[in-house]
Design a protein with these regions (language model features):
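Conserved alpha/beta-hydrolase
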Residues: 44-76
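Short beta-strand/loop motif that positions the catalytic acidic residue
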Residues: 238-240
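Conserved alpha/beta-hydrolase "acid-adjacent" motif
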Residues: 245-255
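Post-His helix in hydrolase/transferase enzymes
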Residues: 251-252, 279-293
Length: 297
């Protein structure tokens, strides 16, 4: 497998966006491009096993580190920070356009996980893609997102780019409380070794700024509004862990699925054992196979 790193300007005008491209060494029978839009706190480098699996089957895998994640560090803040939600959407488009220019005749598939799933759901034009996979997404109240964003904007005036333990607890604390007696981050990964890898990864960013929460809430609010008229003009597959609190333990993601299904019959859903990050948990091989089978159809 060939792994290429590219730096291109982010649409926020400050960040050097880190793009990773994984390609088979033999390119005589390429099947398509798979773009990954990763989750919160993580980065594209965590998808090496995914890339190995799919490059061995003739796909090129690529994706960018979202603003303030991984190697896409922003000079505006040392923690998770986004100045404008739309910049994350535009960066995803920029990454696709960069790679598609090199492989103009290959179909493009889109995978969004968690934070990445909301970026995908707020993308205006999905026509360049043949299919999409949304993992660990949910249905949040647009009204609640507006209320919380207004409160945080007032409380943290002048400190929007600074790390906040309260914001971190607001975003992640409630998930852990649903698994009393379990280790920290069990809501994310059920496997002990996988959790250790995650916790020990120096590129995982846990510090969260109020600005990040506010912009993320805008994305969730937009995704919630879009359920009235989903932008799912392409086939969509939803995947989730049965114990995933982000997906509402199946209730939230199924609400999104039903809205998509009404708009496009070519929509499917499947659940797996596990919590939130099923792509990196002990059941990851069955997830990979499910995705590979879906892309082949």
């Amino acid at each position: 497998m060939e792994r290429t790193f590219v730096a291109i300007p982010s649409n926020d005008k400050d960040t050097s966006m880190h793009l990773e491209i994984y390609a088979p060494e033999y390119k005589g029978n390429l099947k398509g491009l798979i773009q990954i839009c990763h989750g919160m706190t993580e980065y594209m480098g965590r998808y090496v096993e995914f890339a190995k699996y799919f490059t061995s089957r003739g796909y090129i895998v690529f994706g960018n580190d979202i603003i303030s994640h991984g190697h896409s560090t922003t000079p505006r803040s040392s923690c998770l920070y986004i100045n404008d939600w739309n910049d994350t959407v535009k960066d995803m488009v920029s990454a696709r356009e960069y790679v598609a220019r090199k492989y103009p005749n290959l179909p493009i598939y889109l995978l969004g996980f968690s934070l990445g799933s909301f970026i995908v759901r707020t993308t205006h034009d999905l026509t360049p893609y043949k299919k999409e996979i949304l993992i660990g997404t949910g249905a949040q109240s647009a009204f609640l997102m507006r209320i919380m964003r207004t409160w945080i904007g007032k409380k943290y005036t002048g400190r929007m780019s600074c790390a906040s333990d309260k914001i971190h607890d607001l975003m992640f604390g409630t998930y852990g409380k649903k698994f009393k007696g379990r280790p920290a981050n069990y809501w994310l990964l059920t496997d002990n070794e996988k959790r250790k890898e995650y916790t020990g990864d120096i590129l995982i960013r846990q510090d969260v700024s109020p600005a990040f929460f506010c912009e993320f809430s805008k994305g969730m609010e937009c995704a919630s509004r879009n359920l009235k008229n989903p932008n799912n003009t392409i086939p969509t597959l939803f995947l989730y862990g049965k114990k995933d609190p982000v997906s509402g333990f199946g209730k939230g993601i199924r609400k999104v699925y039903k809205a998509y299904k009404e708009n496009n019959p070519d929509t499917g859903i499947r659940s797996f054992p596990g919590t939130h990050d099923i792509l990196h948990d002990s059941m990851y091989e069955s997830i990979f196979k499910t995705i590979a089978d879906y892309l082949r159809k």
